Curated annotation (Swiss-Prot):
Alternative, nonproton pumping NADH:quinone oxidoreductase that delivers electrons to the respiratory chain by oxidation of NADH and reduction of quinones, and contributes to the regeneration of NAD(+). It catalyses: a quinone + NADH + H(+) = a quinol + NAD(+). Keywords: Cell membrane, FAD, Flavoprotein, Membrane, NAD, Oxidoreductase. Pfam families: Pyr_redox_2 (PF07992). Binds 1 FAD per subunit. This is Type II NADH:quinone oxidoreductase. It comes from Staphylococcus haemolyticus (strain JCSC1435). Belongs to the NADH dehydrogenase family. Coiled coil: none annotated.
Length: 402
C-alpha cells in the first residue's frame, strides 16, 4: 500500500543526485518507493561546461535543461527548494519550503568555490561556480573590450586578464578564452597584441594528474596563443587592482581589469553544519557510500570523500565519479528495498580529458595519453555521454556536443 512505501529523499540535482534519481525511476516501479528530489534550481546545469559559458564561447542556455524534463512524475516528486538543515536523529530535512522526512537519504549537495581564506578573493575575483557566475563573467569580459574600444583615453589594463589556478578548470577556461579573445578583438576593433592573459599557479606543476609530456603540450598550446604562466607563484591577496603574489619572498602587485579565481572547490557548507568529521565540505564514506553510524544515509558527488579500499587518499571530485556513484547508490537502494544489503562501490576509471578550446586538448583514455583533435573528440564524447546517461537519446541529441 502507498503508506508502506519507503521514502527515498535525494538532495541535489547535479551529476550525482540526478543520476541516482533517473536510475531509480528505471529500476523501481511506482509502488516500490516514494522518491523525492530536492534542488534549489528548477534546472540542472552541466557543471563541467561552466568554463565555456564563463569565457563566452558557449551560451549559458546550452548548459541547462529543466529537471522535470528528465524525471517521471508518476515515480519522482520534484521539490524546488533550498536545503537548510539535515536532522539525522529525527530523519528529517528542513528546507525554505517545508520539512521532509525520509527512510533513505541521498546527500548530493554539490560544490561551491573555495578561496582558501585568501584576502579579498571572494570580493574582487570572479568565480567559475554556477550559471549566474558564468553569465556575469562572460558579460564582464565583453564589456571590458567594448569599453576599451569606445573610450578616448585607452587603459590597457582593461585588456589584462588574470586567472588564478592552473588546474583543470583554469586550463580549460584559458583554452576557451584564447578562442574568445580573437572574436572580441574582431568585433570591437581591438589590437589583439594589447591583450594580456596571465595564469598564476601556486603549485610547482600545473595539471598534476597528467604526465610532463601532456602538461608541456598544454603549456605550449596556450603560450602560443598569448597566455603567460607564473608557476610556483602563490597568490596572497586579491584587490581592486588584481592579484598580489609572492615572488622570491617579495610581494608584487599584478594589475588587470579582470581577475578570475579557478583554483579550488569544496563541498556544500551545509555538510559542516550537518555532520561531524567534515573537511572542506566533504565527509569520508564507507565503502558502500553510506556514512559511519548511518546506514540509511548515502553521501555522493562533491560532498563525498570516498577512499577506495587499500588507498590512503579520497578520489577527486569529478563528474565521472559522481555519476558512477549515483548509479551505484540507485542499485543499492533497490537492494535495500528488496531486503538485501547495499554493496561496495568500485570506481572504474575510463580516463580524463582536459579541453584546450573546441578543437584541441590533452588526456588519458584507458591508460593512453592523447592530444590534439583526438583529445577534443573524446572530450565531446564524454560530455555527450553524460547528458545521454541522464536524459537518453533525445536529450543527447538536443544538448550533446555533436
Amino acid at each position: 500500500m502507498a503508506q508502506d512505501r519507503k521514502k527515498v529523499l535525494v538532495l541535489g540535482a547535479g551529476y550525482a543526485g540526478l543520476q541516482t534519481v533517473t536510475k531509480l525511476q528505471k529500476e523501481l516501479s511506482a509502488d516500490e518507493a516514494d522518491i523525492t528530489l530536492i534542488n534549489k534550481n528548477k534546472y540542472h546545469y552541466e557543471a563541467t561546461w561552466l568554463h565555456e559559458a564563463s569565457a563566452g564561447t558557449l551560451n549559458y542556455e546550452d548548459l541547462i535543461y529543466p529537471i522535470e524534463s528528465v524525471i517521471k512524475e508518476d515515480k519522482v516528486k520534484f521539490i524546488n527548494a533550498e536545503v537548510t538543515k539535515i536532522d539525522r536523529n529525527a530523519k528529517k530535512v528542513e528546507t525554505n519550503h517545508g520539512i521532509y522526512d525520509y527512510d533513505i537519504l541521498v546527500v548530493a549537495l554539490g560544490f561551491e568555490s573555495e578561496t582558501f581564506g585568501i584576502n579579498g578573493m571572494k570580493d574582487y575575483a570572479f568565480q567559475i561556480e554556477n550559471i549566474e557566475t558564468a553569465r556575469k563573467l562572460s558579460r564582464h569580459i565583453e564589456d571590458k573590450f567594448a569599453n576599451y574600444a569606445a573610450s578616448k583615453e585607452k587603459d590597457d589594463k582593461d585588456l589584462a586578464i588574470l586567472v588564478g589556478g592552473a588546474g583543470f578548470t583554469g586550463i580549460e577556461f584559458l583554452g576557451e578564452l584564447t578562442e574568445r579573445i580573437p572574436e572580441l578583438c574582431n568585433k570591437y576593433g581591438v589590437d589583439q597584441n594589447k591583450v594580456r592573459v596571465t595564469c598564476v599557479e601556486a603549485a610547482p606543476k600545473m595539471l598534476p594528474m597528467f604526465s610532463d609530456e601532456l602538461v608541456n603540450y598544454a603549456v605550449n598550446y596556450l603560450e602560443d596563443r598569448g597566455v603567460e604562466f607564473k608557476i610556483a607563484t602563490p597568490i596572497v591577496a586579491c584587490n581592486e587592482k588584481g592579484f598580489v603574489v609572492k615572488i622570491n619572498d617579495q610581494e608584487q602587485q599584478l594589475e588587470a581589469g579582470t581577475a578570475i579565481w579557478a583554483a579550488g572547490v569544496r563541498g556544500s557548507k551545509l555538510m559542516e553544519e550537518s555532520f561531524e568529521g567534515v573537511k572542506r565540505g566533504r565527509i569520508v564514506t564507507k565503502q558502500d557510500l553510506t556514512i559511519e553510524g548511518h546506514d540509511d544515509i548515502f553521501v555522493i558527488g562533491d560532498v563525498s570523500a570516498f577512499i577506495p579500499a587499500g588507498e590512503e587518499r579520497p578520489l577527486p571530485t569529478t563528474a565521472q565519479i559522481a555519476m558512477q556513484q549515483g548509479e551505484h547508490v540507485a542499485k543499492s537502494i533497490k537492494n535495500i528495498l528488496n531486503g538485501q544489503a547495499a554493496t561496495d562501490f568500485e570506481y572504474v576509471d575510463r580516463g580524463t580529458v582536459c579541453s584546450l578550446g573546441a578543437h584541441d586538448g590533452v588526456g588519458i583514455v584507458y591508460g593512453r595519453d592523447i592530444t590534439g583533435k583526438k583529445a577534443a573528440f573524446m572530450k565531446k564524447v564524454i560530455d555527450t555521454r553524460a547528458v545521454f546517461k541522464i536524459g537518453g537519446v533525445g536529450l543527447a541529441f538536443k544538448k550533446g556536443k555533436f
